[in-house]
Amino acid sequence: MDATESRIIEQIDRHRDEIIAFARDIYTHAELGYKEFRTSQKAKEFLEKLGLKVEDGFAITGVKGYLNPEKKGNTSLALIGEMDALRIPEHKYVNPETQAAHCCGHHAQLAGIIGAAIALTDPEIAKTLDGQVVFFAVPAEEYGEIEYKNQLKEQGKIVYGGGKCELIREGAFDDIDLSVVHHTGDEDVLVGSGTGNGFVSKIIRYKGKAAHAAGAPHLGVNALNAATLGLSALAFQRETFQDKDSVRVHPIITKGGNLVNVVPDEVVIETLVRAANIDAIVDADEKTSRAFTAGAYAIGSDYEITTLPGYLPNLAEEANPAVLAAAEAATAGTSYKVTKADTGLHSGGSTDVGDLKH
């Protein structure tokens, strides 16, 4: 470990309590995708306090802090921290105002880039850097609240439901040559990544006819029955999904009716259709649409299926030698173990980091 690396670690250790306090504040004020207004403001204020040039409003809530912008012609490196949380109302540390909780650890990502910013803005360290560093707080990695994101799309505020996809579309990565993304996990320190699923998202809306559920059900058109048949038809498609494609389709009913004694006249389903490659995503998506269409035809309800772009499949990433060496140097003399990622390992989950790699 050279003198600069030692000084970086010293700076982070010196500000340990401040970094942890920032993380805990974000943790207890979790916000959902494209709604991270408080989180965004906190990140902006912290980066400004360090004397960085800061810009905000990227993909609604994204924030960029620039170190050494005069050197961006050499290399421009982004350190990325995701801001959004998950809607988990029953979580012990849920934010009661948003019903969100940081179950995926994005608060730790933000603490990571804040800690890096504290260290790298040290004048003695900053002058050793050959390029620009961009501390980038990004929105909406978790792909929840599909209908809300569709509303933003219809309002012209976004085109893509995923934060990094939208940032790419806006050109927010045009001044960045490479990005470093990190995430909490089971291992002490894991460098590199395996592959992961991509997906499209869908909203299925069944429109029936209300009637008294006991007195005159024959006068109604039961949208919930149409949805139930659609879900059953989808279940019968599962044997056609090949294991090698790692297909995952997991719908939820977000609206199932209004009153127990009224035939449901509107039912809404949201789902992701995931797979390991684009051809498999297209195939599974077509089968999913046919299944939900069948439910509507069987019952005689109207229906509307909206399909939105999700994320591209995540590509494997070999452990970068420089990152690996830095991780090993930083953990030397500690109990932390540095491991190279198994690039052959596939995850059924998804991340919009995949869109950065394509």
Describe the predicted segments one by one.
Residues 2-103, 107-134, 139:
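Acidic/His- and Gly-rich active-site-bordering loop/insert found
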Residues 7, 11, 15, 22-25, ...:
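Generic non-transmembrane alpha-helical segments
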Residues 34-38, 158, 221:
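Soluble non-cytosolic domains of exported or imported proteins
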Residues 55, 156-158, 193-196, 343-347:
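Short Gly/Pro-enriched turn/cap motifs at secondary-structure boundaries
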Residues 97-147, 200-206, 212-237, 271-273:
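Alpha-helical metal-binding/catalytic segments enriched in His/Glu/Asp
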Residues 111-195:
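Acidic/histidine-rich catalytic neighborhood of metal-dependent amide-processing enzymes
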Residues 168, 173-321, 325-326, 346-354:
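Midchain, well-structured core segments that form catalytic/ion-binding scaffolds
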Residues 333-358:
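Zn-dependent metallopeptidase/amidohydrolase metal-coordination segment
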